[in-house]
Design a protein with these regions (language model features):
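Class I SAM-dependent transferase core
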Residues: 1-55, 59, 89-92, 96-106
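S-adenosylmethionine
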Residues: 79-82, 86-189
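Conserved beta-strand/loop positions that form the S-adenosyl-L-methionine
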Residues: 61-63
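Conserved SAM-binding loop of SAM-dependent methyltransferases across substrates and taxa
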Residues: 65-78
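A general structural signal for well-ordered alpha-helical segments in protein cores
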Residues: 13, 43-46, 69, 122, ...
Length: 189
């Protein structure tokens, strides 16, 4: 992956994983309970897209436990990252992470994506396990600025995605210690 990490980022990422484990017992944030699997399937998976993230406002839709949004906020403190989810308990968790890790660049939004009306539009929108690409675009295009782009994290079944009408690049992602195929759909409207 070749991603340089500062000591502070390492500590923040480890603390974040520990908070996921702690809160997951009560709030059911993720089906993944094993800490090692959490590192592989949450942390490393989210880190795999970090080189594709560019400067500008970023929105992570259907953020759930904050993946990949919180990881991006940790790795790119110069970028303002909005994490959006409609489930209150997940937003309370993300707010606790923001506070605990002192992530000044993270904004937690408890809203349905269709109802969200930001003051400024986003230059990039990410999602992981939210909806198929065409549905994600349909629900969020009112939030994307002109020439903005999507970074949609997907598995191997990208041929099932209905994205024929979009300017799209498909990146095959290699996530260390994860045998499942991963893809990143980079879509510009």
């Amino acid at each position: 992956m070749n991603i340089p990490l500062s000591d502070k980022q390492i500590q923040q990422l480890l603390r974040y994983l520990s908070l996921i484990q702690k809160w997951n017992r009560v709030y059911n944030l993720s089906a993944i309970r094993d800490p090692i699997e959490s590192v592989k399937k949450h942390l490393l998976d989210s880190l795999s897209i970090i080189h594709f993230v560019q400067p500008g406002l970023l929105l992570d839709v259907g953020s759930g436990a904050g993946l990949p949004g919180i990881v991006i906020a940790i790795m790119k403190p110069e970028i303002k990252v909005f994490v959006l989810d409609s489930v209150g308990k997940k937003c309370r968790f993300m707010q606790a992470v923001k506070s605990e890790l002192a992530l000044e660049n993270l904004i937690v939004v408890n809203s349905r994506v269709e109802s969200f009306k930001p003051k400024k539009l986003f230059s990039q929108i990410t999602s992981r396990a939210f909806a198929e690409a065409s549905k994600t675009i349909q629900l969020t295009k009112h939030l994307l600025e002109e020439n903005g782009r999507y970074l949609l994290m997907k598995g191997s079944n990208i041929e099932e995605e209905d994205v024929d009408n979009f300017n799209m690049k498909v990146h095959s992602m290699t996530v260390p210690f994860v045998s499942d195929k991963r893809s990143l759909l980079e879509i510009q409207l």
